[in-house]
């Protein structure tokens, strides 16, 4: 039988094992953060304010009940020098990877940070459900911080229980690995562990609580330090009245900044002997990485639902997968967080929110930066973002040989057509590689007809567009604003969110039009829009071959670039939901199937290049199951309903009709 090498008490004690250590037990920990930054050594139990520290030690583990491995990511484990076989052969793996048993060399702790949440400073937040284990040196893959999400109460748990449930853990596990496979900087997820411990949750915010399984994700990143890590030094906020737990401790702020630059931006440290110059170069690099990151999000239709400063990585990673979503139909106003009633973190708002968060980071760094120079760097953000964005979009359209002034307008017009036709974002881009090269004089309509037919299959029906255009504002609130616009225009102009009202009115206008349009008429409009755009796209493609005779090479390059930048698979909500429902019944096979597809988002196949015998048969069976699962299809009808509310679409009511033209007048809108 397996001997038990580690005894857990409070404080945690470690005894030398007489057994041969497993691969997990041989991980080489360095734990630099705890050596270089102030650590709270208090043994006071429970949540509390933690001044003058960047971390708090976790003195007692809170084991899960009968933890068991649900899924492993071989590619994430490889970053630690581990294989899935190593982990599965370790009888204590589930305990180690859920924070139920301390790994040799690890030093459990929780990170202290603050944050601006939905635009307001929230004071001390911190790792309320996350336990830092340490930093592992893995040779060729460098150093990785590892932590367990869902490990129990920490000093930063506030009113929470420190647990994560199976539902949210599956989503984080799959999305972490999906983003990495897409080539987007992200934290990684090495394992998903579930258990027989249950907690009470209200998943629909309906007042109805249910019992859900506690689960844990082992996360990896070069660092989990975030913008909010520097906000613990913030003085009292004039609006919220809150302050950071280490307000005024400029010495610790300098220590944290030095640590981040030395460990994660060593090139900047080496290039600058002057501290202020070094810090400005650091801030510029953080700005650049953030701009590039959000550009990558936008180009795969990803939306981060809680884009607060505490969820912004200081090293430019996608961090903390709470509410998130990959768009199905393209909608610039797409909101993936049911709590985001005002759309602060909508798809189209994400770049400007990232810039806003960078401004809060500059404030937090204070005298470490030159204020005027920091503002100048912030002013470069949108141009930097737009350059990265257009560069990626050119690749998605196969425009790789030339950069034309018209390209930006071509992309904007494409998105406009996708929006008004309700086209599926991922599948439409994937189909554009089938647009024929403009090399003969045949009729445009005849030439592009087949690909237009394929794209039309990805467009929305009238009923789907009605759902899309339903006003997101509560009916009573909208009625009050509409009434105010008619009875007191001056108060309306002062008190209301004119932009938000205009967006709601635009939805009402589109909804009204849809009730006057039948499906056949809609399809004709959609076809005409796509034929017109594809005609413009082919004219632009023709410019790619100016000055060269090797048309075959150009075509080959175009297809190669497009197929490596337009994924076939993304983590759609229904894919995650199917995996969740199966897992809640004890079947983890769907998580593993989804992971296998998401690991190769640009590929039509999923297995190794060659396999023999039994492995080949298993791989073929797995590929057949993945193909049948239809991960590259539009979402099924049930998935197109809002996950939080049952949407019943009716024609615009009399109240909306009565005030529609009055408010259009006062907001300057027309349809």
List where the protein language model places each region:
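ATP-dependent phospho-/nucleotidyl transfer catalytic cores
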Residues: 169, 199-202, 206-304, 315-423, ...
């Amino acid at each position: 039988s397996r001997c038990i090498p580690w005894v857990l008490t409070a404080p945690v004690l470690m005894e030398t094992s007489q057994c041969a250590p497993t691969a997990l037990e041989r991980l080489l920990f360095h734990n630099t953060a705890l050596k270089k930054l102030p650590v709270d050594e208090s043994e006071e139990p429970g949540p509390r304010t933690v001044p003058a520290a960047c971390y708090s030690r976790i003195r007692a583990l809170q084991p899960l009940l009968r933890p068991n491995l649900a899924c492993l990511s071989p590619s994430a484990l490889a970053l630690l020098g581990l294989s899935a076989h190593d982990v599965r052969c370790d009888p204590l793996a589930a305990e180690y990877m859920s924070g139920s048993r301390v790994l040799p060399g690890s030093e459990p702790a929780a990170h202290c940070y603050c944050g601006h949440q939905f635009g307001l400073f929230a004071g001390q937040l911190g790792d309320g459900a996350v336990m830092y284990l340490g930093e592992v040196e893995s040779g060729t893959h460098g150093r990785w911080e590892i932590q367990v999400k869902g490990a129990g109460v920490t000093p930063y748990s506030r009113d929470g229980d420190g647990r994560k449930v199976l539902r949210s853990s599956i989503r984080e596990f799959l999305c972490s690995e999906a983003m990495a496979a897409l080539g987007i900087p992200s934290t990684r997820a090495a394992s998903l562990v579930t258990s027989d411990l249950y907690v009470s949750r209200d998943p629909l915010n309906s007042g109805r609580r249910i019992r859900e399984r506690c689960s844990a994700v082992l996360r990896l990143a070069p660092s989990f330090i975030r913008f909010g890590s520097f906000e613990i030094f913030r003085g009292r906020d004039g609006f919220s009245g809150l302050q950071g737990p280490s307000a005024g401790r400029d010495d610790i702020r300098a220590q944290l900044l030095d640590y981040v630059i030395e460990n994660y931006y060593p090139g900047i440290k080496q290039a600058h002997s002057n501290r202020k110059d070094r810090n400005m170069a650091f801030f510029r690099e953080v700005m650049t990485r953030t701009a590039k990151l959000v550009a990558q999000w936008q180009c795969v239709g990803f939306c981060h639902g809680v884009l607060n400063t505490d969820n912004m990585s200081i090293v430019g990673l996608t961090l903390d997968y709470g509410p998130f979503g990959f768009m199905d139909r393209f909608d610039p106003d797409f909101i993936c967080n049911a709590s985001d009633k005002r759309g602060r973190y909508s798809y189209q708002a994400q770049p400007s929110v990232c810039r806003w968060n960078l401004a809060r980071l500059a404030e937090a760094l204070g005298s470490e930066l030159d204020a005027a120079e920091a503002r100048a760097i912030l002013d470069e953000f949108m141009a930097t973002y737009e350059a990265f964005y257009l560069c990626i979009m050119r690749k998605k359209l196969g425009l790789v040989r030339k950069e034309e002034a018209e390209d930006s307008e071509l992309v904007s017009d494409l998105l406009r057509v996708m929006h008004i036709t309700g086209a599926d974002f991922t599948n439409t881009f994937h189909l554009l590689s089938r647009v024929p090269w403009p090399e003969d004089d045949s009729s445009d309509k005849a030439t592009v007809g087949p690909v237009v037919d394929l794209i039309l299959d990805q467009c929305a029906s009238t009923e789907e567009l009605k759902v899309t255009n339903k006003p997101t504002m509560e009916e009573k609130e909208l009625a009050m604003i509409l009434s105010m616009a008619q009875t007191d225009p001056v108060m309306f102009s002062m008190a209301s969110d004119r932009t938000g009202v205009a967006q709601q009115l635009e939805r009402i206008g589109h909804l009204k039009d849809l009730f006057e349009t039948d499906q056949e008429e809609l399809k004709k409009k959609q076809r005409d829009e796509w034929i017109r755009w594809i005609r413009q796209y082919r004219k632009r493609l023709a410019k790619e071959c100016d000055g060269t005779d090797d048309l075959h090479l150009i075509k080959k390059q175009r297809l190669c670039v497009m197929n490596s930048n337009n994924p076939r698979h993304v983590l759609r909500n229904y894919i995650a939901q199917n995996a969740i429902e199966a897992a809640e019944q004890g079947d983890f096979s769907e998580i593993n199937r989804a992971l296998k597809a998401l690991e190769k988002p640009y590929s039509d196949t999923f297995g190794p290049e060659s396999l023999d015998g039994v492995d080949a048969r298993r791989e073929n069976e797995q590929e057949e199951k993945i193909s049948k699962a239809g991960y590259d299809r539009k979402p099924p009808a049930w998935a197109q309903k809002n996950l939080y509310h049952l949407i019943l679409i009716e024609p615009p009511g009399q109240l909306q009709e009565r005030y529609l033209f009055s408010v259009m007048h006062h907001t300057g809108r027309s349809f």
